[in-house]
């Protein structure tokens, strides 16, 4: 596909503490967080003026789904806009708590595991053609996705019976299948539930649930950008070496537990190969593909960065990518902290630091602190993120949804929307079905808006 629709859905961890003790249950915190949303949206599941969806997911996890984006750069800005919107809800909820005489601080974490061992995800969505072979797509993608954590993991200190280990990925321990139609019970790498949110005769939505939530914009750019290039190669019929893994679920854990990328995983053919070698194989094909096809600036940046990360892992000198890749940034922070205070990796203060990296509250979260000090690289600007909080992407269906919502709210009209429907809840119950996610202008929607 020359143009592709991308979307990210991020579930956030939530807690409320007072002097280190848990103050409210996650359910109660979530209710406070969403009270403002419910007051104007009459629901804890709403679509916003920027085309995004904000809702309370299973287990009291606030979830933000970006609007449909047709560029990875746009997606990065809209993902960050979601963080800012949730941070606004957090500030509001804390004020309300204090007004009611409840002391405590609310925390929102953009991570993937809590202290009780529960996991929540960052789901990537890629629109693909209905006419390709979905099975082949999965076969080629799974070895890539299993080893992709080497270039875009969020990093995690994992406590094991044999002591603490620093892992590449937070999500790896919680993936139980290769391909499946469930997302919570079995947690596959690729979810096959067929909900394209588009014309089902033309499109499928590839739903990848194996990735970590990233704090660094550049890591997000690489995560989605590299997957997009691999998808384009498959769609273009690029011949790939058969790297089918004997046991993807065992492999994903083995890869996560080895930050050198050298541990061998077994292929279905019986051959053994390292995560680094698998990624190098995909990168070589991707570089050649982008050069031959003449990719855009983002594709060129992705391939260049991908190469630098793999070189850093191969040489063992991670410093050249410490400003760009989450797991490396966090590892360096932890190593400095350990050195300064002479602490083992298993120390509770190290675990606290691991968590603080993902704290969304600017001025308190560790990642936000690094960003303010200019110690990490960016892939979006603050004005772009600010604009994305209110304004949908202008080249996709999200524009139609955002415009419809804005006008309906300004005219105080009752309405219902989802990814494909726009409906005015008046006597006529007029509804427009928007099946084409690439279509940003539609006379039917304009007529519906004009009729308000």
Swiss-Prot record:
Pathway: Protein degradation; proteasomal Pup-dependent pathway; Protein modification; protein pupylation
Role according to the record: Catalyzes the covalent attachment of the prokaryotic ubiquitin-like protein modifier Pup to the proteasomal substrate proteins, thereby targeting them for proteasomal degradation. This tagging system is termed pupylation. The ligation reaction involves the side-chain carboxylate of the C-terminal glutamate of Pup and the side-chain amino group of a substrate lysine.
One family name in Pfam for this protein: Pup_ligase
Gene Ontology molecular-function annotations: ATP binding; ligase activity, forming carbon-nitrogen bonds; magnesium ion binding; ubiquitin-like protein transferase activity
Biological process (GO), any one: protein pupylation
Annotated organism of origin: Salinispora arenicola (strain CNS-205)
Disulphide bridges, residue numbers: none
Protein name listed in UniProt: Pup--protein ligase
Keywords recorded for this protein, A-Z: ATP-binding, Ligase, Magnesium, Metal-binding, Nucleotide-binding, Ubl conjugation pathway
Binding-site list for ATP: 53, 66, 419
Matching HAMAP family: Pup_ligase (MF_02111)
PANTHER family, A to Z: PUP DEAMIDASE/DEPUPYLASE (PTHR42307), PUP--PROTEIN LIGASE (PTHR42307:SF3)
Enzyme Commission number(s) from the entry: 6.3.1.19
Catalytic activity of the protein: ATP + [prokaryotic ubiquitin-like protein]-L-glutamate + [protein]-L-lysine = ADP + phosphate + N(6)-([prokaryotic ubiquitin-like protein]-gamma-L-glutamyl)-[protein]-L-lysine
EC class name: ligase
Active-site residues, record numbering mapped to chain: 57
């Amino acid at each position: 596909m020359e143009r592709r629709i991308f979307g990210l859905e991020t579930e956030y961890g939530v807690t409320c503490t007072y002097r280190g003790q848990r103050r409210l249950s996650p359910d109660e915190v979530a209710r406070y967080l969403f009270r403002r949303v419910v007051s104007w949206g009459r629901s804890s599941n709403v679509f916003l003026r920027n085309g995004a969806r904000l809702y309370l997911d299973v287990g009291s996890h606030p979830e933000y789904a970006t609007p449909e984006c047709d560029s990875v750069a746009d997606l990065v800005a809209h993902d960050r806009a979601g963080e800012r919107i949730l941070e606004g809800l957090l500030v509001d909820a804390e004020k309300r708590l204090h007004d009611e005489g409840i002391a405590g601080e609310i925390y929102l974490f953009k991570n993937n595991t809590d202290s009780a061992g529960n996991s929540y995800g960052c789901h990537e969505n890629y629109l693909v053609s209905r006419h390709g072979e979905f099975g082949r797509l999965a076969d080629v993608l799974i070895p890539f996705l299993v080893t992709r954590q080497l270039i875009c993991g969020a990093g995690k200190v994992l406590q094991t019976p044999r002591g603490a280990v620093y892992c590449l990925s937070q999500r790896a321990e919680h993936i139980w299948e290769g391909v499946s139609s469930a997302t919570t019970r079995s947690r596959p790498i690729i979810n096959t539930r067929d909900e394209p949110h588009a014309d089902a005769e033309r499109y499928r939505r590839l739903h990848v649930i194996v990735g970590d939530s990233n704090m660094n914009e550049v890591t997000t750019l690489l995560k989605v950008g590299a997957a997009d290039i691999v998808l384009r190669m498959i769609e273009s019929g690029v011949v790939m070496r058969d790297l089918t893994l004997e046991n993807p679920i065992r492999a994903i854990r083995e890869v996560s537990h080895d930050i050198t990328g050298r541990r061998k995983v077994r292929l279905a053919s019986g051959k053994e190969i390292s995560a680094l070698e698998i990624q190098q194989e995909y990168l070589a094909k991707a570089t050649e593909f982008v050069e031959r096809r003449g990719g855009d600036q983002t594709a060129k940046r992705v391939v260049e960065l991908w190469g630098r990360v793999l070189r850093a892992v191969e040489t063992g000198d991670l410093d050249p990518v410490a400003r760009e890749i989450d797991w490396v940034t966090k590892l360096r922070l932890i190593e400095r902290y350990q050195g300064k205070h002479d602490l083992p990796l298993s120390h509770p203060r190290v675990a606290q630091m691991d968590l603080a990296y993902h704290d969304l509250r600017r001025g308190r979260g560790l990642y936000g602190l690094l960003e303010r000090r200019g110690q990490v690289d960016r892939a979006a600007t603050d004005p772009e993120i600010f604009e994305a909080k209110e304004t949908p992407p202008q080249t996709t269906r999200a524009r139609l949804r955002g415009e419809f919502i804005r006008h309906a709210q300004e005219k105080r009209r009752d309405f219902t929307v989802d990814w494909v429907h726009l409906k005015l809840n008046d006597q006529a119950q007029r509804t427009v079905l928007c099946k084409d996610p690439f279509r940003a202008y539609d006379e039917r929607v304009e007529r519906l808006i004009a009729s308000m």
